[in-house]
Amino acid sequence: MSHRLIIKGCLRRARFTLDLDLDVDVSRPLGILGATGAGKTTLLRVIAGLERDFSGRVEFCGEVWHDGDHFDRIPTHQRGLGVVFQDGRLLPGRTVESNLAFAQQRARKVNAAVSYEALTEALDLNHLLSEPAEVLSGGERQRAALARALLARPRLLLLDEPLAANDADHRQQLIGHLAEWLPAEGIPLVYVSHAAHELAQLTRQLIVLGRGTVTAQGETHVLLEAQSEAIGRVARPVAAVVMSTDVERSTATLQLDHDAAGAPLPGERVLLQRELTEDSGLGAALQPQPDENEG
C-alpha cells in the first residue's frame, strides 16, 4: 500500500527558510539527516500541523492536511499521527499508565500486531507505570512517549531523535524493537536523527537537509556511504581521549589513543578528523549548540 507524502512550500525562520518540494512514498521508512539548525524538527512540525504559517501544501495518502493558499487545514489531533520529539513530551499531572491509557482510548481501530504488555515490557516501562510523568528521567520519558505513540496505532509515525536520552544499550534494543514492530504494524515512518547507524537500521530512503533546503535525496545506504567516503577523503580519523574540560574557558585537553572511539566527555573517547602524531599539541574548543527545537 502506498503512503504518499507531499510537502510543497516555504516557512521563514530567523536562521533559515524551510523551502520544500517533496513527494515521497513513506511506506519505505524515510530518514531525515542534517546538522543542528538545518530544519529537521521544523519539517516534522510542518507535517504534524504545528506550523500554521507554512505557506504551502501538505498531503498524505491523497488527503490535504494543510493548504496555506486557502487557509485550510486539518487539526493535528485529526491526522492520526504518532509523534515523539526529543524531549519525550508527556501529559503533565498524569502517571505513565494514564498517559498510555490516553493513547489507547484514541487509538485507531486496527488489528494490533504488538500488544500493550509486549510494548511496556520491551520498553522497560512496567516498573514506571505508577510514576508521575514529572519524575521520569529523559530516557524514561522518551520510552514512555514512544510507547504512547505506538499504542495510538498511528497512520504515520514521526520520530525526532527519540532515543537520544537513552544509554547505548537501551538505544540498540529500541532500534531492534522498532525495526521489528513497524513493519508488523504496517506503520509508515519519518525518522529524524544525527546518528547514521540509527538511520541505516531503521530507514530505507533518506533526505539530507541544509539550512532548510534538501541537499540530497536517495537510498539511505547509498547516501550514508557517500557521506562516509567524503569524510574519509578529507582526513584520516585519529582517536583521542578527553582528559579534562574547562567549560568556563570552553577548552578541552585531549590525549591520542589509536584504539579509541566514542563521545567527547572527560575520560571518554572521540574521533578527530585531523592528521596528527604522538607529539602533536592537541586542544579542542567547546561550542554550545542551538536548541534543535529552533530548527
Residue ranges and their predicted role:
Residues 132-136, 140:
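Conserved ABC ATPase signature
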Residues 65-82, 106:
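ABC ATPase NBD coupling module
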Residues 151-155:
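A short, proline-enriched helix->beta-strand linker immediately N-terminal to the Walker B motif
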